[in-house]
Amino acid sequence: MKRHLNTSYRLVWNHITGTLVVASELARSRGKGAGVAVALSLAAVTSVPALAADTVVQAGETVNGGTLTNHDNQIVLGTANGMTISTGLEYGPDNEANTGGQWIQNGGIANNTTVTGGGLQRVNAGGSVSDTVISAGGGQSLQGQAVNTTLNGGEQWVHEGGIATGTVINEKGWQAVKSGAVATDTVVNTGAEGGPDAENGDTGQTVYGDAVRTTINKNGRQIVTAEGTANTTVVYAGGDQTVHGHALDTTLNGGYQYVHNGGTASGTVVNSDGWQIIKEGGLADFTTVNQKGKLQVNAGGTATNVTLKQGGALVTSTAATVTGSNRLGNFSVENGMADNVVLENGGCLDVLSGHTATNTHVDEGGTLDVRSGGTATTVSMRAGSVLLADSGASISGHYDDGGMFSIGDGRAAGLTLGAGSVFTLQEGDSTRDTTVNGGQLTAHGGTLEGTTTLNNGATLTLSGKTVNNDTLTIREGDALLQGGSLTGNGSVEKSGSGTLTVSNTTLTQKAVNLNEGTLT
């Protein structure tokens, strides 16, 4: 992690050399306040002899152009325009041997400055700069005001009392906003190149103080530390916001927001392709999830006063806490119980062992996952929905065509498994009248009862010995029967076009009839 702007500076008189020299005051902890650079008064400057390489721009004076190199100092109480700064950081991060650079004192102004590698611009309290461009290896230490800084791989460290407005952070650039500092209208274009939620920490924007109206674009990242606050942030696709502190009124326009343990997010709006993730110990309040947006609340996470609009997705488990409203009214997930949850467009509810869900509505694109020992009652499954369960769960509900289904006491009946759905039959259990429409039926032993139907895209996976004393029917389209053995006095019937592929399976049935199609 880069550190060399985590330093405040002061000018002191060296009695041996008879010159002004720079003394740094290091802040060893990035979250702690550093010493404040001492602003020189005009009287102090004029009373101190300076070397030829050290220049002073007096109050009321304007200097245009020039280059600072080789530890030169420019002390600005007037106005400096168009300077190039190539000195001040030659010795690297937090090195007290660093001297030189541009000093903007109380009342001083610098415009259109270029800071190259190894260069440092220091803006003390009461000083102001505008339109500074900082390249890789260069930096700006800010205790005054800076407007329209561009970080092309360079760094801007905003100390207590400093205000940075309109900073643009490009690839490998870094803005650190310390406690007591403010950054407004920042544009972040870097920091997330390491992938979602990767804590790069040395690029993008790191907030210990306050960040207001930040725009996070593709590859951009804002990290809000435990003591930091971000207000009115907009995150676009490919960008993300990592919250350990406080985030207020964030809008996710395809971007991601991660709320970590101890972090809080209030008033987040999740639009199409946006994703808010609440991790264990994280808290979200008053989140609004619009169509194609997603709210994910992990085990131990909390989201309250959620507004889940039609087409929005909720991803959670009964180990989380989520309360709010959806298109059917109020819903809740708390204390191991879920009620009136709507799942669609990538939404998913995991019902854990010993936990309960009631009145669950699983619409197109939604998934209900009931673990062994979990219970779900009054379930509504619509076309395009997904059920994940095994015979150790307890489930009752209906499909949108009116068909009823149930799982309980090791017996399943009336299941229809569409694409993505998986039912696992455990040894010693049974399933009756199961229809597999592109989903998967996995049997670790057990018994197939009634008519088991495999339609196009269906998979029946056997492990061990499974008994079929009734009828296994394969209709239109292709299906796969793989592994294990199928025994008993039942029959296998292939009808309709398509191919039944039998792979590593032993069939011991009363009859195997190929009426139409192909058996391979």
Predicted regions and their residues:
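Bacterial Sec-dependent N-terminal signal peptides
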Residues: 1-41, 45
